Amino acid sequence: MNQSYGRLVSRAAIAATAMASALLLIKIFAWWYTGSVSILAALVDSLVDIAASLTNLLVVRYSLQPADEEHTFGHGKAESLAALAQSMFISGSALFLFLTGIQHLVRPEPLQAAGVGVVVTLIALFSTLALVTFQRWVVRKTQSQAVRADMLHYQSDVMMNGAILVALGLSWYGWHRADALFALGIGIYILYSALRMGYEAVQSLLDRALPDEERQDIITIVTAWPGIRGAHDLRTRQSGPTRFIQIHLEMEDNLPLVQAHVIADQVEQAILRRFPGSDVIIHQDPSSVVPAAQQGFFER
């Protein structure tokens, strides 16, 4: 799983870096030629895109390193750190947009050769749409937090490019403050995306439990197994591509140890079939030693 995961996530990061680099060169020319503050906003965002995607590429490769003596649970949390770093980069670019937009709102300037800006923005819009489509497919296959953060960033780019087209069109017809107003609006949206991304990264670093539907799937698997009277203390978290699942199973007091082990092993394999690559720890408890207040999800 890790090989397939690493290959897909690396390809997504390489594709994002290559596209952002190409668009950066085009946007530098377009900004120099038109003087559009919205295109300048997109140019700055492309710089952030390159830095973020390169960070993703390096971090993903590091996160896939096997566990060692100092990192016995692996290096998957590096992905969450990358997402947190991205949120900081993006927040910085949003603040830059605010300052630039306010400056041009106070002192509006007519655009030069707005048609060039429209062509460049259309190229950026369709290129970014293609990248986001590919990233969404990678996220669906891998659930990578780093790629999901990158995808959210590029989704904001799609919104940005659409807003730039409208701003350029309005400025073309004499509404020169529209360029600055849209830059401010874009900055607000980017800042919102950055805060949401940072929140998700922090939750992962704090070992937030798996989603409710995944925990319910685990409970469903356990409840379907004969020989298990109950279950409690389900604890879950995720680090990179790896889910960590711990659960206590309640069994008959007089069940032979070997048979209890076989049942627990079968349950573990069933969980792994549902969540491949997970780290599963199962503890077996005689049902009589479990206090009533701790008895868990069901009782047969």
UniProtKB/Swiss-Prot annotation:
It is a multi-pass membrane protein. InterPro entries: Cation_efflux (IPR002524), Cation_efflux_CTD (IPR027470), Cation_efflux_CTD_sf (IPR036837), Cation_efflux_FieF (IPR023783), Cation_efflux_TMD_sf (IPR027469), CDF_Transporter (IPR050291). It comes from the Bacteria. The keyword NAD does not apply. It catalyses: Zn(2+)(in) + H(+)(out) = Zn(2+)(out) + H(+)(in); Cd(2+)(in) + H(+)(out) = Cd(2+)(out) + H(+)(in); Fe(2+)(in) + H(+)(out) = Fe(2+)(out) + H(+)(in). GO terms for molecular function: cadmium ion transmembrane transporter activity; ferrous iron transmembrane transporter activity; metal ion binding; zinc efflux antiporter activity. Zn(2+) binds at residues 45, 49, 153, 157. One of its GO terms (cellular component) is plasma membrane. The chain crosses the membrane at residues 24-44, 82-102, 114-134, 156-176, 178-198. Divalent metal cation transporter which exports Zn(2+), Cd(2+) and possibly Fe(2+). May be involved in zinc and iron detoxification by efflux. Homodimer. NCBIfam families: CDF (TIGR01297), PRK09509.1 (NF007064). This is Cation-efflux pump FieF. It comes from Klebsiella pneumoniae (strain 342). The gene is fieF.
